[in-house]
Amino acid sequence: MTMNIAKMIDHTLLKPEATEQQIVQLCTEAKQYGFASVCVNPTWVKTAARELSGTDVRVCTVIGFPLGATTPETKAFETTNAIENGAREVDMVINIGALKSGQDELVERDIRAVVEAAAGRALVKVIVETALLTDEEKVRACQLAVKAGADYVKTSTGFSGGGATVEDVALMRKTVGDRAGVKASGGVRDWKTAEAMINAGATRIGTSSGVAIVTGGTGRADY
């Protein structure tokens, strides 16, 4: 079971003060425990790709992070650049203000810009930032992500005060059905919480506590 859950973990280090040494350590841990990916900021993608060369651990990065308030064109460029540097998964933040303004067409275009830039070269996960949304907005965001061709919907950046909840994961799974994966992220620090998220429908876990989860401990960081 430990190895099964390891394959669902995006081993994450997104804090702005992360050093190269810490990124290398993250990659070493990912190789040791067999995590699905490492998730790092775009500036560290080349480093992670170098460290993980020849392994099946994928490099994941973030787009429009953490606010989601850049333009579709900017997010598309970030995506192309990240893939050129070695990323094989991208976690993008939706335009939250546009969603709340009822500008669904813009939200969909924003997601589609990243999906088209990834063009089958990288998985696209769409962060809806559940802590800032009503349930109706969460459903609408997930529907737009699926419509735009995203591979996953994801709960949180970990930078907006609230992380994944079992209720949100279940709602997102109900909304997307089998059309997309669901990634629970933010505040998942131990085995019990990770298991609860998976039971609610999560198929990927984003956490900086991956080692603690698979070794039975409890991590301290939010993300």
Swiss-Prot record:
Recorded family membership: Belongs to the DeoC/FbaB aldolase family. DeoC type 1 subfamily.
The protein's name in its UniProt record: Deoxyribose-phosphate aldolase
Keyword Lyase applies: yes
Enzyme Commission number, as recorded: 4.1.2.4
GO biological process terms on file: 2-deoxyribose 1-phosphate catabolic process; carbohydrate catabolic process; deoxyribonucleotide catabolic process
GO (cellular component) term, any one: cytoplasm
Record-linked NCBIfam families: deoC
Organism: Geobacillus kaustophilus (strain HTA426)
Pathway(s) it belongs to: Carbohydrate degradation; 2-deoxy-D-ribose 1-phosphate degradation; D-glyceraldehyde 3-phosphate and acetaldehyde from 2-deoxy-alpha-D-ribose 1-phosphate: step 2/2
GO molecular function, one term: deoxyribose-phosphate aldolase activity
